[in-house]
Curated annotation (Swiss-Prot):
Listed name of the protein: ATP synthase subunit a
Keywords: ATP synthesis, CF(0), Hydrogen ion transport, Ion transport, Membrane, Thylakoid, Transmembrane, Transmembrane helix, Transport
Subunit-structure text: F-type ATPases have 2 components, CF(1) - the catalytic core - and CF(0) - the membrane proton channel. CF(1) has five subunits: alpha(3), beta(3), gamma(1), delta(1), epsilon(1). CF(0) has three main subunits: a(1), b(2) and c(9-12). The alpha and beta chains form an alternating ring which encloses part of the gamma chain. CF(1) is attached to CF(0) by a central stalk formed by the gamma and epsilon chains, while a peripheral stalk is formed by the delta and b chains.
CDD domains: ATP-synt_Fo_a_6 (cd00310)
UniProt-listed NCBIfam families: ATP_synt_6_or_A
One GO MF term: proton-transporting ATP synthase activity, rotational mechanism
Keyword match DNA-binding: no
Residue ranges crossing the lipid bilayer per the database entry: 33-53, 92-112, 130-150, 196-216, 217-237
Origin: domain of life: Bacteria
Amino acid sequence: MMPLIHLWTSLPVAKLEVGHHFYWHIGNLKVHGQVFITTWIVMGILIVAALAASRNIQRVPSGIQNLMEYALEFIRDLTKSQMGEHEYRAWVPFVGTLFLFIFVCNWSGALVPWKLIELPEGELAAPTNDINTTVALALLVSLAYFYAGLRKRGLKYFTKYIEPTPVLLPIAILEDFTKPLSLSFRLFGNILADELVVGVLVLLVPLFVPLPVMALGLFTSAIQALVFATLAATYIGEAMEGHGGEHEEAHS
């Protein structure tokens, strides 16, 4: 495992950086410490919310329980619409975790004044403001749809690369690379651009002028979380393919 990590860190792409970072050294690895800090904060928020919602469950939900049940119902419907009636249940936790994590990450960047917290080097920002986070999430989705396809269809899964004709093999292989690329760079680019625009406006103009832009940022941040989760569910549903008929029934 360690030789693979050293091989990855030796590649030129592993040395690409955006902005200044607060580094932590773990053995021979150099990681972005500010991303770990904000990621742990987001994870803590989600864990506390889940515990608060499930601590004293009521038959008639209210407060945080009502909010979490609404989120669960929304995620369940989203997953069902993309995978069909008989396949979606096993994937609700995965898609839901992606959606909630990205949603809270994005909103933390829009609502929390991370830049007021001083670090020895670099600055805090939303975890999804770092390309490493979005690439990791996209690779998780890639592993998930490969796993779903192999689990559902076995080795027949690989026949999709030569259907309906072997001529499409290069395009099918290329698609497996473009999916995680588009997922990661879309999310990273939108969140980074939003935080940069708001940051510049706050420096140049009074407080009340950037407020509409911040409100728009909250909306686009939620949309990006929805887009990522929807595409993840779609890719997993397409990989299984055995649900084709059920998928059509779910939309009929």
